[in-house]
């Protein structure tokens, strides 16, 4: 903090620094022009980003090193920083405080005065006033001049002038709390994951700034800290955490003093077959690239050409390389700071500042070529990868030519297994990609042949994450799919205009095998036809796993979770849980308990692979699945838990469970026909991820299961000792009077059932595939489908809690 405080200079950032371009009415009339889409959630989240960007501008100027974003219980958001604090003096032109000017006048702020900020982000350069205009209410607190100032707004209108509410405050900074307007936004619920991604991105781009994200909306608060001293080099390693790097990161940091443009670059080649380049200007992502991206690509091609010519390595190559070959497996984060950037649109998705290109191209060419010359061994490995890419591209070209020659001799270019639709208009045509010939036959009978085409895929789908392009083209299933779609597949041939269907629907079984095939197909589309996803043409069908019949009524349920939910809901209104014969849980209170028990049950199922499930549950609901089990004071509680366990597992062939405590382990044992059965619980296991989560959840239901419980459903009574007993009793009661049919696959349905549940546009449910954050999607596909095991293990461990029922 001391360095930041030393840089503080009130006179350099005061009311005179605030420049004004007036008018807020247009913001309320056309909010989408200023904040983004108000219907899909992007504009809502940009409200937070606009305020955060102002704090980051303070950090870029050297005055702020801590930003905090808090999602409050009432639905509002608070963003605070420890910067200089917004100026509070009276603005000469406006006659009101500078803080009020900033919050009520469009295009008002320090970023419009070049002496205040050298470079700045901000969403659209329209200022935080847009956030105020689109908020039901907003509260601004400022700590400056050893005082605390407060001003409030309703629908963008000032309640009262800025006022001092505290004095002798040894603090500097700004805090904005706002509640989005329900009249503007379709939905005002913020998504933690979306915000988390953007804040992590900002923390990587602004090394040394600590960003805290706190979610207070739920019973258990959630807090994530983002702080990276490694900057964008750490960002590249984070993005590529599931891949093998060919060499250490190449890092470039340079500034052009004449133009004021600075460049940060971190890059490395990995063992994958896909390029991943992220471009930023003043901390804002350009998804469509621009002059900085063009300059970078040109520079890299020049570097490789120059290095090959200098070393003579080009003589070893069988094929000439292209720019695409040089970028195969390249992961790069390119961040430029530009004093006055120009973009192609309000959303800043493409940089068009022409002065950026020569600065970036010259800097990248000079510095990266220098690195190549200083690291001959690593450079040789990179060149070998590029040559391999060129050879694979040539092999793919020959494979395509062979395919074209074969197609020219055929009467129809469409694959034989495709049952095409009659419609020729892609806008109304649908293609169902179906798992297997059996399901394909049923789908062909049940479809609406006017608009629905069926393509059955039989056999193993290729994992394109681990396959080169030429190998992919050699796959029968992938080749059939490419031909049916009609678009071509690589950058040279792909044409979205040639797509024959504007709904491409993946329809697989609702089991683990179906999920795996679906993931393989999603990997193909993400890697080789991302345009289909971007345009919203790719969907996932939702076939049911169960058919339930109750009396004359029949209905379908999507999966195990939906069936369990139905059985619980059909029982809960007729159920009463009595505690010690006195207190009763019914209705919403009982449902709340059951929801916790369902999650608890799922955790126990997951942990049962590592330790006995029954023992784990008994210890957890007695608050003993932790180090308390080693304490003498817990012996009576442990014996009570064993008594319950033995009553549940009573058997004439087995003795009761007994326990022996050791220094670092607890042994549970019993004898079955003279043979000893032993379960060892190690002290270190108690600190494992699974057991800690089970213990946390068990504490929320501990008080209930510490009592004598009786479940009454209609006229039937059940004695309840454990959470599993309670859940099983509820579910079994729900099964009475109904028949349940489980479909093992789509082929088990008849054509009418498939039409009613999955094909009929009027009744079906489709999930549209969208990629909200490209680099997060990149990481997930690399983690799940790549060949690095450790990141996949960590991913499964981290997300295990989200799986309540796993159908295996």
From Swiss-Prot:
Co-factor binding comment: Binds two Mg(2+) per subunit. The magnesium ions form salt bridges with both the protein and the DNA. Can also accept other divalent metal cations, such as Mn(2+) or Ca(2+).
Residue ranges constituting the Toprim domain according to the UniProt record: 429-544
One Pfam family matching this protein: Toprim
Assembly with partners or alone: Heterotetramer, composed of two GyrA and two GyrB chains. In the heterotetramer, GyrA contains the active site tyrosine that forms a transient covalent intermediate with DNA, while GyrB binds cofactors and catalyzes ATP hydrolysis.
Taxonomic lineage of the native organism: Bacteria, Pseudomonadati, Pseudomonadota, Alphaproteobacteria, Rickettsiales
InterPro entries recorded: DNA_gyrase_B_C (IPR002288), GyrB (IPR011557), GyrB_hook (IPR049353), HATPase_C_sf (IPR036890), Ribosomal_Su5_D2-typ_SF (IPR020568), Ribsml_uS5_D2-typ_fold_subgr (IPR014721), Topo_IIA (IPR001241), Topo_IIA-like_dom_sf (IPR013760)
Binding of Mg(2+) 1, residues: 435, 509
Enzyme Commission designation: 5.6.2.2
Cofactor list: Mg(2+); Mn(2+); Ca(2+)
Name of the protein in its database record: DNA gyrase subunit B
Compartment(s) of residence: Cytoplasm
Catalysed reactions listed for this entry: ATP-dependent breakage, passage and rejoining of double-stranded DNA
Keyword Transcription recorded: no
């Amino acid at each position: 903090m001391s360095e930041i405080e030393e840089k503080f200079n009130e006179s350099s950032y005061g009311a005179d620094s605030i420049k004004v371009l007036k008018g807020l009415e247009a913001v309320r009339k056309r909010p989408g022009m200023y904040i983004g889409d108000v219907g899909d959630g992007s504009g809502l989240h940009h409200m937070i980003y606009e305020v955060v960007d102002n704090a980051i501008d303070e950090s870029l100027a050297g005055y702020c090193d801590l930003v905090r974003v808090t999602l409050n219980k009432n639905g509002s958001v608070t963003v605070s920083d420890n910067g200089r604090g917004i100026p509070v003096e009276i603005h000469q032109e406006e006659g009101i405080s500078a803080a009020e000017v900033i919050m009520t006048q469009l295009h008002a702020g320090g970023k419009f005065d070049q002496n205040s900020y050298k470079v700045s982000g901000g969403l659209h350069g329209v200022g935080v006033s847009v956030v105020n205009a689109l908020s039901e209410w907003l509260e601004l607190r400022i700590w400056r001049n050893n005082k605390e100032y407060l001003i409030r707004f309703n629908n963008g209108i000032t309640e009262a002038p800025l006022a001092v509410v505290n004095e002798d405050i040894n603090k500097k900074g700004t805090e904005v709390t706002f509640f989005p307007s329900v009249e503007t936004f379709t939905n005002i619920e913020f998504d933690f994951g979306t915000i988390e991604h953007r804040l992590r991105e900002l923390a990587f781009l602004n090394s040394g700034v600590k960003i805290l994200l706190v979610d207070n909306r739920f019973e258990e608060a959630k807090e994530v800290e983002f702080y990276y001293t490694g900057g964008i080099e750490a960002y590249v390693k984070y993005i590529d955490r599931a891949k093998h790097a060919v060499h250490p990161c190449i890092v470039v940091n340079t500034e052009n003093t004449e133009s004021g443009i600075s460049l940060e670059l971190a890059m490395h080649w990995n063992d994958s077959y896909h390029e991943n380049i992220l471009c930023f200007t003043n901390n804002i992502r350009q998804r469509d690239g621009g002059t900085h991206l063009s300059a970078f690509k040109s520079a890299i091609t020049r570097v490789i050409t120059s290095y090959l010519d200098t070393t003579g390595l080009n003589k070893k190559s069988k094929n000439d390389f292209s720019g695409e070959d040089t970028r195969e497996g390249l992961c790069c984060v390119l961040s430029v700071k530009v004093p006055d950037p120009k973009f192609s649109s309000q959303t800043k998705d493409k940089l068009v500042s022409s002065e950026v290109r020569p600065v970036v191209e010259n800097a990248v060419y000079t510095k990266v070529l220098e690195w190549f010359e200083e690291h001959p061994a690593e450079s040789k490995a990179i060149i070998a990868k590029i040559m391999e890419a060129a050879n694979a591209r040539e092999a793919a070209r020959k494979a395509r030519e062979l395919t074209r020659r074969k197609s020219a001799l055929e009467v129809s270019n469409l694959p034989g297994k495709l049952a095409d639709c009659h419609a020729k208009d892609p806008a109304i045509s649908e293609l169902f990609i179906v798992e297997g010939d059996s399901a394909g036959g049923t789908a062909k009978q049940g479809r609406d042949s006017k608009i629905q085409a069926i393509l059955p895929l039989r056999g193993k789908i290729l994992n394109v994450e681990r396959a080169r392009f030429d190998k992919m083209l050699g796959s029968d299933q992938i080749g059939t799919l490419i031909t049916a779609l009609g678009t071509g597949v690589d950058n040279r041939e792909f044409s979205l205009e040639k797509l024959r269907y504007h709904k491409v629907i993946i329809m697989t079984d609702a089991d683990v095998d179906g999920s795996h095939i679906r993931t393989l197909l999603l990997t193909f589309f993400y890697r080789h036809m991302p345009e289909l996803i971007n345009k919203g043409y790719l969907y996932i069908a939702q076939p049911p796993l169960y058919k339930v019949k109750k009396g004359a009524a029949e209905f379908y349920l999507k999966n195990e979770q939906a069936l369990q939910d139905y059985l619980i809901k059909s029982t809960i209104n007729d159920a009463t849980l009595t505690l010690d014969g006195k207190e009763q849980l019914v209705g919403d209170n009982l449902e709340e308990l059951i929801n916790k028990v369902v999650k608890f049950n799922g955790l126990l199922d997951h942990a049962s692979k590592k330790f006995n499930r029954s023992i784990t549950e008994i210890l957890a609901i007695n608050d003993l699945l932790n180090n308390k089990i080693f304490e003498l004071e817990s012996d009576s509680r442990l014996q009570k838990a064993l008594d319950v366990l033995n009553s549940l597992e009573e058997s004439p062939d087995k003795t009761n469970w007994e326990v022996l405590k050791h220094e670092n382990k607890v042994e549970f044992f019993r004898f079955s026909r003279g043979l000893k059965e032993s379960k060892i619980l190690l002290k270190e296991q108690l600190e494992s991820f699974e057991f800690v989560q089970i213990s946390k959840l068990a504490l929320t239901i501990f008080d209930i299961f510490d009592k004598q419980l009786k479940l009454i459903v209609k006229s039937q009574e059940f004695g309840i000792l454990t959470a599993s007993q309670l859940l099983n009793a509820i579910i079994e009661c729900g099964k009475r009077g109904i028949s349940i049919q489980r479909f093992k696959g789509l082929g088990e349905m008849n054509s009418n059932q498939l039409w009613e549940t999955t094909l009929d546009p009027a009744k079906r449910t489709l999930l549209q595939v969208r990629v909200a954050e490209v680099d997060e999607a990149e990481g997930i596909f690399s983690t799940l489908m790549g060949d690095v095991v450790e990141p996949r293990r960590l991913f499964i461990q981290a997300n295990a809690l989200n799986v309540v029922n796993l159908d295996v």
